[in-house]
């Protein structure tokens, strides 16, 4: 495979400009579909359409699958429904085809489905479209090798050969009974190495790991991670085999989930990228910035209440960034750890008290170390015992409070069915800033009121 480089990109653009379809086709033939998709994503609509038309139908389907979702939608809007059905969808796996069709307007969906030549494929796609895209049923594919438990191994091999052209990879053969209920699996190695006279029921692996069609993506990801499998069958409520999810589909979902959580942790309210228009980017970024602004206003009002303290002890203003920043960092660390455990499913109800207690113990150690370091610093540079005590004691309390809130808030959000990933972002930072300033001012005022 030829790797996409800046030099190759320049060559490909030259072939497009000079209408050299032969060289463009020859170069595309030696490239991976992912690299072709990356190249086409950056082209104008007209050039992208021309580039796709020089590809064989099978490779067009692979390239379309790998393209950026928004860019794919733009390009497909220029392609007739019949062409989408016969040249693209027909050469896709059912799960990829369902994802593509689901992303289009409803009237285009019906037109494309009506033009798919393979009625069985069209029916399978319609079945997948009925599932929520964030469930196991929404990401499974229908392409798989299914055999009856009463068949012989030669019959199993014949079925594998018959379906081989429709499958990119064959990980397992799925064994069902007469009612289509999944009762076992056959790894490909077992099919190859067992004597040809064996009956399937005697060599299959019974009670395989399964997913249900209504399982959430979190459950799907957790199951793949827990059992370290490359493919897991999906069944309905009656145990009937409905499809299979492969590891490549899960990796795609994990990447999308990670990107979404990273954006939420950064204070973005929706999935955006640099190619989105100004209004969409503004709408995604502005809400949390406005909330942060309101938090800052409350913070300034809070500090204004203690203006008499600043008048008496101007030095304490030097440590406001230290108090606020340390509290925010500690809260972010604690919330991130809890959110990760919740995402992995390793934090159940029984472990919550122990987790909070463990986090508080860690916070006590961190608070003690930070407070002592700041106390030593102030001893040499500030030389005011009350300032030293006020800053160090405030840091100690703020670190413990921030750690507690960072652990508890994601748990509370998870309990009320709000994505706890949001708690790792500006929400924790704003709250810790307010708490930090209140603690700092209260302790400072109390110490100076008592000792001076």
Predicted region positions:
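Extended alpha-helical regions
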Residues: 155-158, 433, 437-440
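Mid-bilayer segments of alpha-helical transmembrane spans in multi-pass integral membrane proteins
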Residues: 112, 124, 399-404, 434
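Alpha-helical transmembrane segments and their membrane-interface boundaries
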Residues: 258-396, 400-404, 408-422, 426-431, ...
């Amino acid at each position: 495979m030829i790797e996409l480089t800046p030099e190759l990109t320049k060559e490909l653009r030259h072939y497009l400009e000079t209408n050299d379809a032969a060289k463009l086709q020859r170069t595309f033939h030696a490239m991976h579909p992912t690299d072709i998709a990356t190249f086409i994503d950056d082209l104008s609509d007209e050039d992208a359409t021309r580039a796709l038309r020089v590809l064989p139908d099978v490779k067009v389907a692979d390239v379309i699958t790998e393209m950026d979702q928004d860019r794919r939608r733009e390009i497909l809007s220029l392609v007739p429904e019949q062409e989408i059905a016969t040249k693209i969808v027909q050469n896709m796996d059912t799960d990829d085809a369902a994802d593509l069709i689901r992303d289009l307007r409803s009237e285009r969906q019906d037109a494309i489905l009506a033009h798919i030549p393979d009625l069985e494929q069209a029916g399978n796609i319609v079945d997948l479209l009925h599932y929520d895209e964030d469930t196991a049923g929404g990401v499974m594919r229908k392409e798989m090798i299914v055999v009856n438990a009463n068949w012989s191994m030669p019959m199993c091999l014949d079925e594998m050969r018959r379906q081989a052209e429709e499958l990119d990879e064959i990980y397992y053969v799925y064994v069902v009974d007469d009612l289509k209920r999944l009762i076992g699996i056959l790894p490909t190695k077992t099919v190859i190495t067992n004597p040809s006279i064996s009956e399937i029921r005697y060599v299959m692996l019974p009670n395989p790991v399964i997913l249900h069609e209504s399982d959430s993506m979190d459950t799907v990801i957790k199951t793949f991670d827990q059992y370290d499998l490359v493919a897991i069958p999906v069944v309905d409520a009656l145990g009937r085999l409905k499809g299979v999810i492969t590891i490549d589909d899960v990796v795609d979902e994990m990447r999308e989930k990670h990107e979404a959580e990273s954006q939420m942790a950064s204070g973005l309210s929706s999935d955006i990228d640099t190619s989105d228009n100004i209004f969409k980017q503004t709408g995604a970024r502005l809400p949390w910035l406005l909330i942060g602004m309101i938090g800052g206003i409350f913070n300034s009002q809070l500090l204004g209440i203690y203006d008499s303290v600043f008048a008496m002890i101007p030095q304490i203003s030097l440590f406001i960034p230290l108090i606020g920043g340390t509290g925010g960092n500690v809260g972010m660390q604690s919330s991130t750890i809890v959110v990760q455990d919740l995402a992995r499913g390793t934090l159940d109800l029984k472990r919550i008290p122990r987790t909070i207690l463990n986090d508080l113990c860690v916070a006590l150690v961190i608070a003690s170390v930070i407070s002592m370091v700041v106390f030593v610093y102030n001893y040499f540079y500030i030389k005011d015992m009350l300032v030293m005590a006020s800053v160090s004691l405030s840091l100690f309390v703020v670190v413990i409070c921030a750690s507690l809130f960072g652990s508890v808030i994601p748990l509370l959000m998870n309990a009320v069915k709000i994505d706890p990933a949001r708690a790792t972002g500006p929400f924790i930072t704003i709250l810790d800033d307010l708490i930090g300033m209140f603690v700092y001012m209260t302790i400072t005022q109390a110490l100076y009121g008592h000792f001076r």
